[in-house]
Amino acid sequence: MYIKNVHLINFRNYDDMYLELSPNTNIFVGNNAQGKTNILESIYYSSIGKSHRTNKDKDLIKWDKNNTYLRTYVSRERLDKTIDINIFKNGKKAITVNKIKIKKISELMGNLNVVMFSPEDLRIIKDSPGNRRKFLDIELCKINNVYYHDLVQYNKILSERNTALKNWNNKINDIIDIYDEQLSKYGAFIIKERNKYLDKLNIIGKNIHKKITNDLEDINFRYLTNIKDFDNAEKELLIVLKKNRKKDLERNSTSIGPHRDDFEVSINNIDTRIFGSQGQQRTAVLTLKFASLEIIKNIIGEYPVLLLDDVLSELDSNRQKFVLNSIDKIQTIITCTGIEEIDKYLDKKQSQLYLVNNGKIKRV
């Protein structure tokens, strides 16, 4: 798949911008705060219905306007997709795909698949487990509508259970029993799907990581959960929830479940989060992203669009070379402040250059 064109009205610093894209490599060059990342953000939003930079949709609207409009035309092997999104300052939004109204975000996902790599993605390795859970959830939601549904249901029931814990009495105890059964059902599915995804990452990611590091490093991903028997995860999770209820009542929160899980990234059997160098951590994220590309390709039969937001300057020459030599079959949209460092690795015949200045884009 690839994006043919993008039309933005009142989006961030763009008044009215229409952009034709190459199906190959697109490079947006400009100083900071000129609008390069805004282009990627609009594409990312058209893919999953949320921004990678803010939780507030109103932040996407040009400061003096009441709404913003995004149109993304996507070329697919079977059926092209036109995604139209209107976002209003009052919190409402309207989304259509090929003029059919989208009622749930799950109906939007899968029409345009993207994988984004930005400097902030280093948090997946370095920071709290929540960043790693978010990575897994986003990648799984792209390819599995059932996962999206069960994740939404799990979080809804989890919130209700936590509220019940804060207002506990003997009657509420029976309600918590019902919540525990529901959490076990949805939670077990989430745990098993996350573990399966990490199994796929291990198979694909190991080969990618060896290519990047010239066979010097071996990477491994391991899911960290209190559940020991994945085949009986629902039963085991229910037992542990009941066992931990007293502790949960004291803390007014649910202490166990997929919302507390994590995954470990190790290089040569060493925990990358704690002991890895910054270079190793960046390479681990690079492996995650390129493995995710391959997983999506294996499932839907097409590569997603790759978005690289000012990350090439963060990589050494070997990593830059790997990235630019690996995208010949993938529509890639790159933002950077200059192309001097990567110019020697670019396929000029397959690359389109754009200059970005204060919300204006010039094709070179």
From Swiss-Prot:
SUPFAM superfamilies associated with the record: P-loop containing nucleoside triphosphate hydrolases (SSF52540)
- Ligand binding (ATP): G30, N31, N32, A33, Q34, G35, K36, T37
PROSITE patterns under this entry? Answer: RECF_1, RECF_2
Q: Where in the cell is it found?
A: Cytoplasm
Q: Which UniProt keywords apply?
A: ATP-binding, Cytoplasm, DNA damage, DNA repair, DNA replication, DNA-binding, Nucleotide-binding, SOS response
Q: Which GO terms describe its molecular function?
A: ATP binding; single-stranded DNA binding
| Domain of life according to the entry | Bacteria
Function noted in UniProt? The RecF protein is involved in DNA metabolism; it is required for DNA replication and normal SOS inducibility. RecF binds preferentially to single-stranded, linear DNA. It also seems to bind ATP.
Name of the protein in its database record: DNA replication and repair protein RecF
Which species does this protein come from? Answer: Clostridium botulinum (strain ATCC 19397 / Type A)
Instruction: Please spell out the taxonomic lineage of the organism that makes this protein.
Output: Bacteria, Bacillati, Bacillota, Clostridia, Eubacteriales
Gene name of the record: recF
